[in-house]
């Protein structure tokens, strides 16, 4: 597995299925960009190269290395062996084609799905403070920072969530991406189940809620949602039973209170 640099951490089953989720933002007859959020520890150069090769076979030069971005949610409970650098595949005892192939397949399929569902719409952005969802994993080390530096911040961790909301002109909201800094380590180093960890679970809860809400007004919609932990730092998930519910409720609040359109 990929996550704790532990050769003894060998997958024995699946906690829940991993997903690749994509949005394409395009101008009519103009520029476009693809953003893929992958339920994996990280993306890899060799994965992107292979994905671009497949997209070029299907779409020509429409999608290239310049307008396709692939990002991982940083789960520490995902499959290993799909990166091209030795240091990252030592604990999986080398390159694992099974991991690599299924990741490439999933990314390719989600981009094709997004391409085939391009529709006119708008993008909104919002920010808010989410409390009690994570803690500093080394508060004592944080205190070694100069006092003047620490006084600039209210907390010893970043508690700001940024959320992009995608709205179809006809259907209304169809999905979101968000950035919130917490580490994907709720599943410990003794875990042997493939999992999207806290960000993957939060995304699935969000999708279930979104699909149930959306089914009231449409028969068939593809929803793409995901928590995107790019500001990871030293923040670890806070351990309490209602943390996922807290995060989901906060997402709902953000989705309902957009004030800025881009």
State where each predicted segment sits.
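Conserved beta-alpha junction segments in alpha/beta enzyme cores
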Residues: 1-262
């Amino acid at each position: 597995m990929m996550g704790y640099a532990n050769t003894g951490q060998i997958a024995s089953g699946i906690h829940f299925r991993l997903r690749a989720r994509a949005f394409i933002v395009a101008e009519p007859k103009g520029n476009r960009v693809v953003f893929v959020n992958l339920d994996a520890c990280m993306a890899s150069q060799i994965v992107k190269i292979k994905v671009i090769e497949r997209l070029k076979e299907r779409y020509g030069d429409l999608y290239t290395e310049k307008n396709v971005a692939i990002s991982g949610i940083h789960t520490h409970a995902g499959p290993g062996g799909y990166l091209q650098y030795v240091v990252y595949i030592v604990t999986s005892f080398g390159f694992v084609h099974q991991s690599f192939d299924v990741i490439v397949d999933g990314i390719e399929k989600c981009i094709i799905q997004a391409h085939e569902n391009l529709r006119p719409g708008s993008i909104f952005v919002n920010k808010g403070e989410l409390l009690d969802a994570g803690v500093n994993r080394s508060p004592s080390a944080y205190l070694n920072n100069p006092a003047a530096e620490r006084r600039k911040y209210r907390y010893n961790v970043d508690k700001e969530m940024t959320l992009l909301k995608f709205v179809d002109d006809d259907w209304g909201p169809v999905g979101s991406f968000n950035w919130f800094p917490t580490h994907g380590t709720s599943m410990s180093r003794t875990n042997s189940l493939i999992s999207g960890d806290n960000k993957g679970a939060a995304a699935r809860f969000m999708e279930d809620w979104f699909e149930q809400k959306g089914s009231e007004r449409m028969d068939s919609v593809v929803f793409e949602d995901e928590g995107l932990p790019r500001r990871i730092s030293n923040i670890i998930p806070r351990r309490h039973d209602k943390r996922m519910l807290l995060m989901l409720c906060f997402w709902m609040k953000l989705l309902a209170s957009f004030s800025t359109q881009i």
